[in-house]
Amino acid sequence: MANVTVIGAQWGDEGKGKIVDWLADRADAVVRFQGGHNAGHTLVVDGTTYKLSLLPSGIVSGTLSIIGNGVVLDPWALKQEVEKLEGQGVTINDDNFAIADNCPLILPIHRDLDGLREAAAGTGKIGTTGRGIGPAYEDKVGRRAIRVCDLEHLDSLEPQLDRLCAHHDALRAGFEEPPVDRERLLGDLREIAPFVLRFAQPVWKRLKKVRKAGAKILFEGAQGVLLDVDHGTYPFVTSSNTVSGTAASGSGLGPGAAGFVLGIVKAYTTRVGSGPFPTELDDEIGQRLGERGHEFGTVTGRQRRVGWFDAVLVRQTCAISGVTGIALTKIDVLDGLDTVKICTGYRLNNNVYDYLPSHAASQAAVEPIYEEMEGWSESTAGARSFADLPANAVKYIQRIQELIECPVALVSTSPERDDTILMRDPFMD
C-alpha cells in the first residue's frame, strides 16, 4: 500500500480538508509539512463543522496527527485551536498529536512586522493574512528563529534573543515603532512553553518507526501550488514551498515516502487576495458560482475571486508537483448552468501560450482562450457513483482529464465526507 501526499493544485481553498478527512480514516498518520495557520480547512463530519487552520485534518477522526518541521508554528493559535476542538468533543493528547521539536515559532513580533509592512505597502499589497507567516520564515532562513526545542532552554536564550531582537529592532525603527519588549516576549514564551512541550518530539524518528511498521502515512499540504514561493504567481505567493516535494524536507522522511501525489482541484477556479487570475469572472455567473460555492476564506473571511476552470494552470501544477491523480471538488456548484467553459490556452502579444509565463506583468496580461461545453440541469449533489452523474457532467470531467494530462482519481459532490466518487484508490496504488 502507498503513502499519499495531498496538495492543492490551484490557489488553495480547493477542498483539501474534506478529501484529507476522507482519506484520514484509512491512514495511520497524518502529517502537516509546510505553511502555518494562514490556510484553513473546513470539515463536515456527521453534520458537525470543524474549522482547522493549523492542526492536521486527521485529528478529528483520532488519527495520529503530526506537525512537521516545515511548518511555522504559532503556539498561541495552536492552543486556541486545540481548546476549541476539545470543546467540540475531539480528544487531543500526546498519543495522537505530535509537534516537531525543530519546528520554528511564530512570535508576536512576526505578526507586528507583517501588519506594519502590509499597512505601508499601499497599492502594492500582496494580500498577506497578517499572521506573521512570512516574517517567521524569514527568521528561519536567516538563522534567527526561536524553535520549539528552545522552549525547554529559556534560561539560556539570551544570545538568540540578542540576534533576533537586533534584526527586528532595526526593522521596527524604520516604521517608527519602539524596540521589541524582550521581557514581555520572554514572559509570553515561559507561559506557553508547558503546553507546547507536552507534544514536542523528534517526529522524523516517530515517522520512521511508523513507516517501518508498514503504516500508511498521509501528508497534508496547505494552500496550493500556484502560491508556491518558487513556482507560484510571484510575488503574490506564500512564503513556503507548497509542492509535493516539500513533504520530504518538511517532515524528515525521504522523498521516496511521498507515495501517491493527489492534487486537489476545484471544478472551477478561485483565488483570495491580489494577483493575476486569467479566468476571473466579474459578471453574474461569477457571483452565482461564488454564492453557490460559499466562497469565503476559512481563516480571513475574505470573499474569494471566482473564475472558470483553467486547464493550463492545472496541467502546469500537476507537472511541477508530480501529481499522480486529481480529486475534482465542487462539481455540484456548476449544476444548472447552460454553458460551462474551460481555459485551454492564453493569448499574449499575438502569441498563444500553453503555460503561464513567469513574469508578473505577463501573467497579468494574458487573455484566456476558452472551450465551451454544454452544461447540465440535473443535480450532481450527493452523487456517489459515476452512474449518478448527468451525461454532460461526465463529459466535462473527462475533458478536464484530457486537457490536464492527468487522471481523475476522485470526484467530490458535496462537503459531506461520504459524497465522494472513487475511480482510483490512492492508498492502493
Swiss-Prot record:
Binds 1 Mg(2+) ion per subunit. It comes from the Bacteria. It catalyses: IMP + L-aspartate + GTP = N(6)-(1,2-dicarboxyethyl)-AMP + GDP + phosphate + 2 H(+). Mg(2+) binds at residues 13, 40. Pathway: Purine metabolism; AMP biosynthesis via de novo pathway; AMP from IMP: step 1/2. The keyword tRNA-binding does not apply. Its EC number is 6.3.4.4. It is found in: Cytoplasm. Keywords: Cytoplasm, GTP-binding, Ligase, Magnesium, Metal-binding, Nucleotide-binding, Purine biosynthesis. Belongs to the adenylosuccinate synthetase family. PANTHER family: ADENYLOSUCCINATE SYNTHETASE. This is Adenylosuccinate synthetase. The gene is purA.
